[in-house]
């Protein structure tokens, strides 16, 4: 730990964070400590996934019984698994997708990370809403830009200590796209829909 680093890189992380990635990692920790969610909206290729994995490693080093949920488009599920295996091999991963899903097994096991797709989360929300997650990560968080969509309503039912939204394009059409994502991270901070408009 030096003067420019509020938090050292996790010992369990199998990578060296670039200075800007370290700042993002520290930012997630600081927001988590004040119970505020974080939206990381870097361009593609700047390491949003690595910064997030660093944050999960930090939480795991503080509590090895922690449980994390990563929700992403189904096409990215195995990419997340590969990145976790590469950079955080100590974190055990359960993929909740397709046939043969067994969420109860995950909850009763020593596995730390559950990865699921948005559609599966929506269909199985009765299971996902029960735990109090140590962290919930939404990758491609613009998937919840529609405040009234079933997927968004399901995501809002999740309970967690820390919330992270990742997106290279948090605003696709207009600034209201951001409202639902920020309302997940910081409920009620932006006021009602009409006030925000």
Model-found features: residue ranges?
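ASCE P-loop NTPase motor core, strongest for the SF2 helicase catalytic module
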Residues: 2-197
């Amino acid at each position: 730990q030096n003067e420019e680093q509020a938090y050292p890189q996790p010992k369990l992380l199998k990578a060296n964070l670039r200075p800007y990635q370290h700042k993002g990692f520290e930012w997630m920790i600081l927001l988590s400590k004040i119970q505020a969610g974080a939206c990381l909206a870097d361009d593609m290729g700047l390491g949003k996934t690595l910064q997030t994995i660093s944050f999960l490693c930090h939480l795991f080093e503080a509590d090895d019984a922690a449980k994390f949920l990563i929700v992403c488009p189904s096409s990215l599920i195995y990419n997340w698994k590969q990145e976790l295996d590469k950079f955080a091999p100590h974190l055990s991963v359960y993929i909740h997708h397709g046939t043969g899903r067994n969420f109860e097994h995950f909850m009763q096991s020593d596995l730390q990370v559950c990865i699921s797709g948005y559609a599966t989360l929506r269909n199985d929300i009765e299971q996902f809403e029960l735990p109090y997650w140590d962290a919930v990560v939404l990758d491609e968080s613009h998937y919840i830009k529609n405040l009234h969509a079933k997927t968004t309503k399901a995501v809002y039912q999740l309970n967690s200590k820390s919330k992270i939204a990742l997106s290279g394009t948090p605003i696709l059409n207009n600034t209201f796209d951001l409202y639902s994502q920020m309302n997940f991270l910081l409920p009620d901070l932006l006021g009602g829909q009409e006030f925000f408009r």
